[in-house]
Amino acid sequence: MGGNLKNIKRQISSTKNTQKTTKAMKLVSSSKLKKAEELARRSKVYAKQLSAVFHDVVAKIRVRGLDNINSRYFAKSEGREIKKLDIIFITADKGLCGGFNITTIKEVLRLMETYKQQGIKVRLRGIGKTGISFFAFNDIEVLDKAIGLSAAPTFEKAEAFIENVVEDFLNGATDEVIIVHNGFKNMISQELESQAILPLTINIKQNEQPSVLNIEPEDEENIILDELAKKYVQYNMYYALVDSLAAEHSARIQAMDAATNNAGDLVKSLTISLNKARQEAITTELVEINAGAEAIK
């Protein structure tokens, strides 16, 4: 009986230590989430402004009768055939964040199978140790690998990562590029995002007039459009990273909160078991004492 009591006490002590760890991890992620959420908010504002300028340049070109936009970043035709496609996936470098990583991985696997059935060759480019390790374990090739980027994204790092992807697209090595990641929705939920970032498509209403820029002459418009297109793709990559980071911390807060609560419930359950074991030990001792007393009589 004594051994059982010691075992339960050890379990209680171990569970309490785990509870302290998960609680601390929740607090750390809560602090990081505030920073990541603010970064995502500011990035979204900039992305909208960039998109507005981008639309304005395209609208100006079309208003002047230049329907043939001279930029390699745009789709040449709506019904173009896709034979080769690149998927960029973003996962965390670490686990302990619920279904955050596996949701992205499952979506990538689903897309790979879907495109395979359509006869489209798919290549992977990975950000985040968890996803990269998963595909390596399953002997699935990942072309470009970035560990540490999803945990500390900067525009410069995003720009460097997407450089090879853009070059492959412009050289015809791939026909389309998709980013798959978990996006931040709110404090308690994340939303799976699957976005095509290349080629660019832009919807301009027939009579839409440009309002932001005053660019001359026509050649300059196309030069600016090409530079804007490149920056637009780079910033989409950066925003996906920032959005994913906020979602990661949100998921980790939920996971650590659930783990902390579960540990608390387990401690309560073990404490009840400990008290029962103590009562049984006391009862056994009393029975043995009474039995001894009766034997003496």
Swiss-Prot record:
Chain spans, region Disordered: 1-23
Main location: membrane
Any single biological process term in GO: proton motive force-driven plasma membrane ATP synthesis
Taxonomic lineage of the native organism: Bacteria, Pseudomonadati, Campylobacterota, Epsilonproteobacteria, Campylobacterales
Gene Ontology terms: cellular component: plasma membrane; proton-transporting ATP synthase complex
Keyword Cell inner membrane part of the UniProt annotation: yes
Domain of life (superkingdom): Bacteria
Keywords linked to the UniProt accession: ATP synthesis, Cell inner membrane, Cell membrane, CF(1), Hydrogen ion transport, Ion transport, Membrane, Transport
Biased composition regions of type Polar residues, renumbered to the chain: 10-22
Family named by the database record: Belongs to the ATPase gamma chain family.
Signal sequence, start to end: none
Keyword Cell inner membrane tagged: yes
Compartmental location: Cell inner membrane
Free-text function comment from the UniProt entry: Produces ATP from ADP in the presence of a proton gradient across the membrane. The gamma chain is believed to be important in regulating ATPase activity and the flow of protons through the CF(0) complex.
Topology in the lipid bilayer: Peripheral membrane protein
GO molecular function: ATP binding; proton-transporting ATP synthase activity, rotational mechanism
Protein name, entry field: ATP synthase gamma chain
Pfam families documented for this protein: ATP-synt (PF00231)
Quaternary structure (record): F-type ATPases have 2 components, CF(1) - the catalytic core - and CF(0) - the membrane proton channel. CF(1) has five subunits: alpha(3), beta(3), gamma(1), delta(1), epsilon(1). CF(0) has three main subunits: a, b and c.
